[in-house]
Design a protein with these regions (language model features):
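Helical substrate-recognition/capping region of FAD-dependent monooxygenase/halogenase enzymes
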Residues: 5, 9-14, 146, 214-439
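Core Rossmann-like FAD-binding/catalytic domain of the broad FAD-dependent monooxygenase superfamily
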Residues: 1-278, 283-287, 366, 436-439
């Protein structure tokens, strides 16, 4: 797993991260100011106390079980085998899906390429078959050979890994429980049918990390962490709903659902309107349009396009090998996008730059100009957009301002802004009371 290797390497190099192998959480107790964990090791048990605990311990989360937290949602009938094999297979890099194959009637098979000549084969088990039966080596080998024969790739292969799983669309009702914050599969369980399993966990972490950092550093109020739960539970519900549709399409739970699915498949190559029924809806990014961190809703509605409050920034190509997000890079903190005309910075925009100059937390001001990049020490950096692509995609004109959270979701925007509005929007985006902002 390259991602895990890269993350582990980063953690090992970071002076503030301590990795403790071979240790298990066996107890958890919360107080008003800290959480105490009971840790079991080969050398005995000890206690570890921290201000906050982030539980990212997977679908079988020990922390979730110790806290007796129950998930809500649905578990679907049917069990599936995932088998990763190493083989030289001459097929393009795309996901192949087969419905009702001759060797596995009434079920389906997924096949797709992974790095280093690894191929993932995923198929549904016949009803009533146990996990032990499904993973019996001789039977598993016959089924993998049947898949390879079906795709006309009867090659030598080696089994890398195999397991059995069930499809679930389950989530906790909230992800923040006192000083314990749950994320990833510890907070929700999603089916694999295009439902962004690991991506959803990364989005959880991206949402939580900056908020926890702001609270720990005293830059934000503790209610900011409640917005993590609000936003990500809503995202989990959306993904569960879409994942449920995909799961019912892949494994119809009733004869009527199967009849509809088969009709869609049979007509899909000739009837264009049916393609929308097979669209991977979860490829759309989630937007936090109902977030309590968004400010100036009335002003946001004045726009006729662009990136609305709650939506993630759009990356715009400015020139060959030059994009808008390149200018933002990996800088931590809030971002202000200020759009200027050929005349450069106006008085209001200069006042906004001055008002955000010495905040306690990091904020980066990016000026977008249609002319050659300006030489202005107040901004970092300045982006030249001679083609006007950013102006068009952001429905911007000279004087337009976008306020962007550290996780790159827009939380306020104005056709014309003044310094007081920007500062008040920053207060709301850092967890201070709602309703403090002008409109």
């Amino acid at each position: 797993q390259y991602i895990e290797e890269y993350l582990l390497g980063y953690c090992q190099r970071h002076p503030l991260i301590d990795i403790r192998w071979g240790q298990r959480v066996v107890a958890i107790a919360q107080g008003d100011a800290a959480v105490t964990l009971g840790i079991d090791t080969p050398d005995g048990e000890y206690e570890l106390t921290a201000e906050w605990v982030v539980a990212a311990d997977g679908g079988r989360s020990t922390v979730r079980k110790l806290m007796q937290l129950r998930m809500e949602g649905r578990s679907y009938p049917g069990r599936f085998v995932i088998a990763d094999i190493k083989a030289k297979i001459d097929l393009p890099t795309e996901r192949l899906c087969f419905f009702d194959p001759a060797w596995n009637p009434g079920n389906n098979v997924l096949v797709h390429r992974q790095p280093d000549d690894l191929w993932r084969i995923d198929f549904r088990l016949p009803d009533g078959e146990t996990e032990e039966q499904a993973l019996e080596p001789a039977l598993l080998k016959r089924r993998i050979n049947a898949v390879l024969s079906m795709i006309k790739q009867e090659v030598e292969w080696q089994l890398d890994w195999a397991t059995v799983y069930s499809a679930n669309t389950l989530t906790l009702g909230k992800f923040v429980h006192g000083r314990v914050l749950l994320t990833g599969d510890a907070a929700h369980l999603l089916p694999i049918f295009g439902v962004r399993g690991i991506n959803t966990g990364l989005q959880d972490s991206n949402n939580l990390a900056w908020k926890l950092a702001f609270v720990i550093n005293g830059w934000a109020e503790r209610p900011l962490l409640d917005s993590y739960s609000q936003e990500r539970v809503q995202a989990a519900h959306e993904i569960c709903e879409e994942g449920g549709k995909s799961t019912r399409f892949m494994t119809p739970p009733s004869p009527g659902t199967r009849l509809l699915r088969d009709a869609v498949l049979s007509w899909s190559l000739s009837e264009d309107f049916l393609k929308d029924l097979m669209h991977w809806r979860t490829s759309r990014p989630h937007d936090y349009r109902d977030s309590s961190l968004n400010a100036f809703a009335e002003v946001d509605r004045e726009f006729h396009g662009g990136v609305a409050c709650g939506q993630p920034l759009r990356n715009i190509k400015l020139a060959a090998n030059d994009h808008l997000l390149d200018a933002i890079g990996s800088k931590a903190g809030f971002h202000l996008l200020l759009f200027v005309g050929k005349e450069g910075l106006t008085g209001d925009l200069r006042e906004i730059l001055a008002a955000t100059e010495n905040l306690a937390y990091p904020i980066h001001r990016l000026i977008v100009t249609p002319a050659a990049p300006l030489d202005d020490p107040q901004a970092d950096p300045i982006v030249g957009d001679a083609q006007g692509r950013t102006y068009s995609k952001y429905d911007a004109s000279p004087g337009t301002v976008y306020l962007v959270r550290p996780d790159l979701h827009v939380c306020a925007r104005w056709r014309r802004a003044n310094p007081l509005q920007v500062v008040q929007a920053l207060r709301q985006a850092t967890g201070f009371a709602e309703g403090c902002c002008l409109s």
